[in-house]
C-alpha cells in the first residue's frame, strides 16, 4: 500500500514503538477473516500480528480520512475507557467529531433526536464494543474504519487496521500514529522532523493512579514547606524593622556632645573659658555677706536672753 516509496516506509523507530506498546500481540482466539493479518502463533497460544500489514492499513485509513474535505464530517468513537482519551486527542489534532463514552442509539438514523449526525466517515476503536454505531452506519451507507484484534468481527467494517485494541498503550499509540499520518498527508507537519506531541498524551490513565500521584505530590509539597519553615521561623519572629521600634520607645536624655579638637597644639585655646570661671568670685562675696549679717542678728538675740 505504500507504493514502494521510501518516504512511506515504516521506520525503525516506529517498529520499536509498536513492540514497546505490544501492538503486535493479539489474542488466543482468531477470526477467519483476520487470518491474513497473522504472522505466527506463540507456544502459549497468542497470535502475533504482522506489523507490515498494520502499517499498510494505517496508511490506507489515513488516506481515507484526508479525502474528506470537512474534517468535522469524520466521526471517531470509543465506548471503552482505554480509547476515550485517545479519541479526544485525535479529534483535537485532526478536527474530527469525537463521541467518547456511551453511543446513543439512533444518532445516525433517528432524525428527531437532538444528537442526530450525518458523518461521511466513521472510525471506531473496537468493532465488538462499538457494534451499535457500525450497525447504524451500514443503514445509512457510511464507510467505516476499525482497529481490529485477532478475534474481532469484521462485519460492516470497510478498512480493518490489525492491532492490539485491548491494551491501553497499544490503543493510544495507534490513534497517535493515525493522527500523525493524517497531519503529514495534509501537509500540516513535515516527515523530516519528528512530531512534537508525545504518544503518552494518548494513553489511558486510571483515575485511581492519578489520585495517588496527586496525593503524593501534595504530601511532598507539605513536607517541603515544613522543612523550610523550621529554618525560616526564627527569622520571621525577629524582623529587622522591630529593632527601630525598640529604640524609639526608650527615652534617652539629650546630652550635648563635646567636640574636641583633632590636633593637640590647639588645646591652649581653651584658656579664655577658664578666665570666665575665675570672674565669678564677685558673686561669692554676696553669698558670704549674707551669713555674716545673720550671725550678728543671732548674736544679738543671745545677748538679750543673757
UniProtKB/Swiss-Prot annotation:
Region of interest (Disordered), ranges: 261-306
Question: Which superkingdom does the taxonomy of this entry point to?
Answer: Eukaryota
Please state where this protein is localized: Cell membrane; Cytoplasm; Nucleus
One BP term from GO: translation
Q: Where are the [DE]-W-[ST] repeats?
A: 230-232, 245-247, 276-278, 286-288, 304-306
Give start-end positions of Polar residues composition bias.
277-306
Q: Where is this region: Laminin-binding?
A: 161-180, 205-229, 242-306
Please describe the post-translational modifications of this protein: Acylated. Acylation may be a prerequisite for conversion of the monomeric 37 kDa laminin receptor precursor (37LRP) to the mature dimeric 67 kDa laminin receptor (67LR), and may provide a mechanism for membrane association. Cleaved by stromelysin-3 (ST3) at the cell surface. Cleavage by stromelysin-3 may be a mechanism to alter cell-extracellular matrix interactions.
Q: Which SUPFAM superfamilies match?
A: Ribosomal protein S2
The record's GO molecular-function terms, alphabetically, read: laminin binding; laminin receptor activity; structural constituent of ribosome
What family is this protein classified in? Answer: Belongs to the universal ribosomal protein uS2 family.
How this chain assembles, per its entry, is: Monomer (37LRP) and homodimer (67LR). Component of the small ribosomal subunit. Mature ribosomes consist of a small (40S) and a large (60S) subunit. The 40S subunit contains about 33 different proteins and 1 molecule of RNA (18S). The 60S subunit contains about 49 different proteins and 3 molecules of RNA (28S, 5.8S and 5S). Interacts with rps21. Interacts with several laminins including at least lamb1. Interacts with mdk.
Miscellaneous field: This protein appears to have acquired a second function as a laminin receptor specifically in the vertebrate lineage.
Q: What does this protein do?
A: Required for the assembly and/or stability of the 40S ribosomal subunit. Required for the processing of the 20S rRNA-precursor to mature 18S rRNA in a late step of the maturation of 40S ribosomal subunits. Also functions as a cell surface receptor for laminin. Plays a role in cell adhesion to the basement membrane and in the consequent activation of signaling transduction pathways. May play a role in cell fate determination and tissue morphogenesis.
HAMAP family to which the protein is assigned, alphabetical: Ribosomal_S2_euk (MF_03015), Ribosomal_S2_laminin_receptor (MF_03016)
**What's the protein name?**
Small ribosomal subunit protein uS2
Q: Give the source species.
A: Xenopus tropicalis
Amino acid at each position: 500500500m505504500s507504493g514502494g516509496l521510501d518516504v512511506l516506509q515504516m521506520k525503525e523507530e516506529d517498529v520499536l514503538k509498536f513492540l514497546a506498546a505490544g501492538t503486535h500481540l493479539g489474542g488466543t482466539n482468531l477470526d477467519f477473516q483476520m487470518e491474513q493479518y497473522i504472522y505466527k502463533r506463540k507456544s502459549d497460544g497468542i497470535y502475533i500480528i504482522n506489523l507490515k500489514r498494520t502499517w499498510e492499513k494505517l496508511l490506507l485509513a489515513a488516506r481515507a480520512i484526508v479525502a474528506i474535505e470537512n474534517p468535522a464530517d469524520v466521526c471517531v468513537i470509543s465506548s471503552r475507557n482505554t480509547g476515550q482519551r485517545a479519541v479526544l486527542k485525535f479529534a483535537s489534532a485532526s478536527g474530527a467529531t469525537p463521541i467518547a463514552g456511551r453511543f446513543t442509539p439512533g444518532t445516525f438514523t433517528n432524525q428527531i433526536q437532538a444528537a442526530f449526525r450525518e458523518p461521511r466517515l466513521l472510525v471506531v476503536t473496537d468493532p465488538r464494543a462499538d457494534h451499535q454505531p457500525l450497525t447504524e452506519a451500514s443503514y445509512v451507507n457510511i464507510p467505516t474504519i476499525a482497529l481490529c484484534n485477532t478475534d474481532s468481527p469484521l462485519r460492516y467494517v470497510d478498512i480493518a487496521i490489525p492491532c492490539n485494541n485491548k491494551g491501553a498503550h497499544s490503543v493510544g499509540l495507534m490513534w497517535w500514529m493515525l493522527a500523525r499520518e493524517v497531519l503529514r498527508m495534509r501537509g500540516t507537519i513535515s516527515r523530516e522532523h519528528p512530531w512534537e506531541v508525545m504518544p503518552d498524551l494518548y494513553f489511558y490513565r486510571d483515575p485511581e493512579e492519578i489520585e495517588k500521584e496527586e496525593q503524593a505530590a501534595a504530601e511532598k509539597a507539605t513536607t517541603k514547606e515544613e522543612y523550610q519553615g523550621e529554618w525560616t521561623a526564627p527569622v520571621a519572629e525577629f524582623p529587622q524593622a522591630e529593632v527601630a521600634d525598640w529604640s524609639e520607645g526608650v527615652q534617652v536624655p539629650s546630652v550635648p556632645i563635646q567636640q574636641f579638637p583633632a590636633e593637640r597644639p590647639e588645646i591652649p585655646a581653651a584658656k579664655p573659658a577658664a578666665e570666665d570661671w575665675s570672674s565669678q568670685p564677685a558673686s561669692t562675696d554676696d553669698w558670704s555677706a549674707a551669713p555674716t549679717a545673720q550671725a550678728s542678728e543671732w548674736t544679738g538675740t543671745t545677748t538679750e536672753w543673757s
